[in-house]
Amino acid sequence: MMNNVRKLKHNYKIMNNANIKIALDFLLENSKIGKSDAIEIISFITKIEYSEVLFSQEKVLNKKQFKKIIKISKKLAKGKPLAYILGYKIFRTHKILVNKNTLIPRMETELIVDYVNEFINSQNEKISVLDLCCGSGCIGISIAIENKDKMENVTFSDISKKALNITSKNIENNNLVNWTKVVKSDFLNSIIKQQNKFNILVCNPPYIDFNDVDVDKMTKKYEPKLALFAKDNGLFFYKEAIKNIDKFMDITKNILIVFEIGWKQEKELDVFLKQELGLKYKWKFEKDYFNNLRYLILTK
């Protein structure tokens, strides 16, 4: 207890003459975060561009700014994700708003956009995309921004109205309103009823089994369970989508489906795909940055 009191007094003492270098050191010492996150916090509080923070280390912070740093540090020390504290996450190079109703975009999910971009560049016609279980909309928004000239439309769908509110804000912030659509749907139910057909499906569905003991404790504590867990060993949503491909994909043309999957799910999914699709479609499994099998990619 005495150590905490001393530390607190020290924090308020350095508040009077703290510059950005001191603030960075304070965050690294007290918050269990890396340097890039510490720079992001300083950028957020001071409004200095991220790329300029390290060139501005002698700039003195005012008391209000340093109090904010202490407050953020305390939240981080308790395990609260930085993205939820700041209210956004940089995904690829795009600023994506998030809150407790959306999953935090992960680095490994970024590769989905690369697979889609490669496919789009090989097509001659304009493309219609469905971002299913969209959460914050980070995947569909990145695809839309990076392929504006080739987009027919992008539809964002999720069961959570609160998540879709964040999606809508991200769409507005990136000037994508005119050629995007937001649909509240219990997975594919409303999508199929509307009878729209798509060239591309991207989907990072709930895929963690309810009994999985490997789930990160802080992920389980802070992120929405609705977006994390699925029945049938976490495979329910993949199977539902695959069984209904012809009801929402434009199978008269080239199609691309990219799922993010759990690293232990490849074998079960492969067996199911062989039983359900036979030779009608081609599929492969690809690894993420960390050498884990993370993507199911399906084409016609």
UniProtKB/Swiss-Prot annotation:
GO MF, one annotated term: protein-(glutamine-N5) methyltransferase activity
Family affiliation: Belongs to the protein N5-glutamine methyltransferase family. PrmC subfamily.
Keywords, sorted A to Z: Methyltransferase, S-adenosyl-L-methionine, Transferase
Keyword Transferase attached: yes
EC number: 2.1.1.297
PANTHER family from the UniProt entry: HEMK METHYLTRANSFERASE, MTRF1L RELEASE FACTOR GLUTAMINE METHYLTRANSFERASE
Species of provenance: Mesoplasma florum (strain ATCC 33453 / NBRC 100688 / NCTC 11704 / L1)
Alphabetized CDD domains for the sequence: AdoMet_MTases
Gene3D superfamilies per UniProt: DNA helicase RuvA subunit, C-terminal domain, Vaccinia Virus protein VP39
HAMAP family reported in the protein's UniProt record: RF_methyltr_PrmC
Domain of life: Bacteria
Protein function: Methylates the class 1 translation termination release factors RF1/PrfA and RF2/PrfB on the glutamine residue of the universally conserved GGQ motif.
Gene: prmC
Annotated positions binding S-adenosyl-L-methionine: 158, 187, 204
Name of this protein: Release factor glutamine methyltransferase
GO term, biological process aspect, one: methylation
Cited InterPro entries: DNA_methylase_N6_adenine_CS (IPR002052), HemK-like (IPR004556), N5-glutamine_MTase (IPR050320), PrmC_N (IPR040758), RF_methyltr_PrmC (IPR019874), SAM-dependent_MTases_sf (IPR029063), Small_mtfrase_dom (IPR007848)
Amino-acid positions noted as binding substrate in the UniProt annotation, renumbered to this chain: 204-207
Reactions it catalyzes: L-glutaminyl-[peptide chain release factor] + S-adenosyl-L-methionine = N(5)-methyl-L-glutaminyl-[peptide chain release factor] + S-adenosyl-L-homocysteine + H(+)
